[in-house]
Amino acid sequence: MPQSALFTGIIPPVSTIFTADGQLDKPGTAALIDDLIKAGVDGLFFLGSGGEFSQLGAEERKAIARFAIDHVDRRVPVLIGTGGTNARETIELSQHAQQAGADGIVVINPYYWKVSEANLIRYFEQVADSVTLPVMLYNFPALTGQDLTPALVKTLADSRSNIIGIKDTIDSVAHLRSMIHTVKGAHPHFTVLCGYDDHLFNTLLLGGDGAISASGNFAPQVSVNLLKAWRDGDVAKAAGYHQTLLQIPQMYQLDTPFVNVIKEAIVLCGRPVSTHVLPPASPLDEPRKAQLKTLLQQLKLC
């Protein structure tokens, strides 16, 4: 089985649950993990954008990775986000993830400098060479300021056999279509996962493999059921779930960054966890909590 086969379907980018003093809330995180696995997800991604990796130090990231891997205990594949602004720390975190027992790593491009294509390729190759784990690229140009183009991704897939997929977080059907055509056309087992809830259906229609999207934290059943209907050949039923997913991104407009929105949605949908977030994020105020509750109720998610 190709390494990439581990990372298809619905893989929530798990929110990191914190205590009021900013420490990892182990019981809260464990309960969320258990809920998601029971919901039928295909894997779990820790320390992505929604996991607040960018607000954490390297040792904190290692501790969270270790806890998550140990608690999942091989029930589903685990991806650990290891990217950042410098190659040395990314390599250190990637090697730690491998030693801790991760199934793969997710690596975003450096996001302070605008990096030349040659240097981007070198960066990802250095990270891929530092581990034997499967490496999933992470494209989020709205936050990094720099797109990983399909041509660049194909070059990386050509170059390193353990670069096996991409989380393509971009609000563009054309970009997803080109990524699938360009990279999967040359490497059929290369995994293309969308990063936005409302792109899951069209990603599957285009020949992609699933989603790593935020609603997996508070409404995993919608994406899980959409994918099941798709795999069963019931396109009309899948399209019905798509109608719900189309409405979810409006919730994320309630604040920036919207990690607080996700945690409040988890609570409103029935899992009482701490909604503490790390600066520069801040708690969602009461008026916006009320707006969020109304949106979730309109979609019959709570």
From Swiss-Prot:
Disruption phenotype: Disruption mutant has reduced ability to catabolize D-xylonic acid. YjhH-yagE double mutant cannot use D-xylonate as the sole source of carbon. GO terms for biological process: aldonic acid catabolic process. A dimer of dimers. GO terms for molecular function: 2-dehydro-3-deoxy-D-gluconate aldolase activity; 2-dehydro-3-deoxy-D-pentonate aldolase activity; identical protein binding. Part of prophage CP4-6. Belongs to the DapA family. It is an enzyme of class 4 (lyase). It is found in: Cytoplasm. The active site is at 49 (charge relay system), 112 (charge relay system), 138 (proton donor), 167 (schiff-base intermediate with substrate). SMART domains: DHDPS (SM01130). This is Putative 2-dehydro-3-deoxy-D-gluconate aldolase YagE. It catalyses: 2-dehydro-3-deoxy-D-gluconate = D-glyceraldehyde + pyruvate; 2-dehydro-3-deoxy-D-arabinonate = glycolaldehyde + pyruvate. Induction: Expression is repressed by the transcriptional regulator XynR. Its EC number is 4.1.2.51, 4.1.2.28. One of its GO terms (cellular component) is cytosol. Its main location: cytoplasm. Catalyzes the formation of 2-keto-3-deoxy-gluconate (KDG) from pyruvate and glyceraldehyde. May also function as a 2-dehydro-3-deoxy-D-pentonate aldolase. Overexpression leads to increased growth (over 2 hours) in the presence of the antibiotics norfloxacin, ampicillin and streptomycin. Keywords: Cytoplasm, Lyase, Schiff base. Pfam families: DHDPS. The gene is yagE.
